[in-house]
Structures are given as C-alpha cells and as structure tokens.
Amino acid sequence: MASRIKKGDQVIVIAGKDKGKQGEIIRIDGHRVVVSNVNIVKRHTKPNPQRSISGGLIDREAPIHVSNIQVLNPMTGKGDRVGFKILDDGCKLRIFRSTGEVIGA
C-alpha cells in the first residue's frame, strides 16, 4: 500500500503548539513523523566518551502524529490533502486533491 506521506516531503503543521510551522519529514515511525525544526524538546543526556557525546541539555525534534500535518502544496503555499491516481500501466502516483498536480514531480 502506498503511503500518503514520504520521507523528504515538505509539510505544514495544522494542529498543536507548532501550528503553522513548515519543515521536511526526517523520519516516519508508524503513525508518527519527525519534522525538521518542529516540536523541539530538551533532552537531558549523559556524557558518553566512547561515542564522543558531551552531556547536558540537547534540543532535538520529537515525533508528532500524522493527523497533525499536511503536505505543503508549492503552487498554493498551503497544506493540501493527498490522493492517488493510477495510470494505465498500473503505476500509482500521489496527487494534490485541490490542483490534481503530481507530488514530487
């Protein structure tokens, strides 16, 4: 089954404390995604000399639920719903519902 969102998509947050922020999908974990520069949290980390990690407070992105994001439509500059279009050769493409444009083309 094809996914409505993919790693590298430009998305906009539509709900939550970071509503309106835009970013790129870094990682997908089931129904949660990590978006660059969105949902920044502080983590207390211990120093680990074997991995050359200095301890202290580190800011990093935390995952948010996929229902709180929409794929950013570059033509309109707004978040848009994602649909699928099946070509004659059986290839499945992701499209924007409002404009019908192919995503990532």
Swiss-Prot record:
Q: Report the CDD domains cross-referenced here.
A: KOW_RPL26
Quote the gene name from the UniProt entry: rplX
Cite the record's note on assembly: Part of the 50S ribosomal subunit.
Cellular compartments per GO CC: ribonucleoprotein complex; ribosome
Q: Which PANTHER family match?
A: MITOCHONDRIAL RIBOSOMAL PROTEIN L24 (PTHR12903)
Its BP terms in the Gene Ontology are:
translation
Q: Provide the taxonomic classification.
A: Bacteria, Pseudomonadati, Pseudomonadota, Gammaproteobacteria, Lysobacterales
Which species is this record about?
Xylella fastidiosa (strain 9a5c)
Q: Which NCBIfam families match?
A: rplX_bact
GTP-binding among the record's keywords? no
Q: Which family is annotated? A: Belongs to the universal ribosomal protein uL24 family.
Protein's UniProt keywords contain rRNA-binding: yes
State the function annotated in the UniProt record. Answer: One of two assembly initiator proteins, it binds directly to the 5'-end of the 23S rRNA, where it nucleates assembly of the 50S subunit.
Q: What is this protein called?
A: Large ribosomal subunit protein uL24
Q: Which GO terms describe its molecular function?
A: rRNA binding; structural constituent of ribosome
Q: Which UniProt keywords apply?
A: Ribonucleoprotein, Ribosomal protein, RNA-binding, rRNA-binding
